[in-house]
């Protein structure tokens, strides 16, 4: 996992890098990492998947009032992991998804990303790695 840590602050993307952010099911990218994702092509109204040089993983419902349960977030993370597997030439910088506006702790979200351990093209926040490898 050495060298596969997402920087705490991402201000620019190198060629082939994808910014992976927490979104809502309405695709309203108005705050947090979702708002930052607009800089790199996130599409207003698109909740999940590849959007420009970004990839959305919903953690809130369409109304943005309800935080999705872990079991509701899990399928979106599974889809992301499959996407990363079939796109090895892209490097995915996963942010602290679900740990900002959705108020989860890394210990809650990190286990969803265990499937990326062997994927060299996925970088996770150090807080996620600590929980996955503990």
Predicted regions and their residues:
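Macrodomain-like recognition of ADP-ribose-binding/processing modules
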Residues: 1-134
């Amino acid at each position: 996992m050495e060298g596969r840590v997402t920087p705490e602050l991402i201000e620019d993307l190198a060629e082939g890098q994808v910014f992976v952010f927490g979104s809502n099911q309405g695709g309203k990218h108005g705050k947090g990492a979702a708002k930052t994702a607009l800089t790199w092509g996130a599409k207003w109204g698109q909740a999940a998947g590849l959007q420009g040089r970004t990839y959305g993983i919903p953690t809130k419902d369409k109304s943005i009032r309800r935080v999705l349960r872990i079991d509701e977030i899990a399928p979106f993370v599974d889809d992301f992991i499959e996407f990363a597997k079939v796109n090895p030439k892209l490097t995915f910088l996963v942010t602290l998804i679900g740990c900002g506006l959705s108020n989860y702790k890394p210990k809650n979200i990190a286990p969803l990303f265990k499937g990326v351990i062997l994927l060299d093209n996925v970088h996770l926040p150090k807080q996620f790695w600590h929980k996955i490898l503990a």
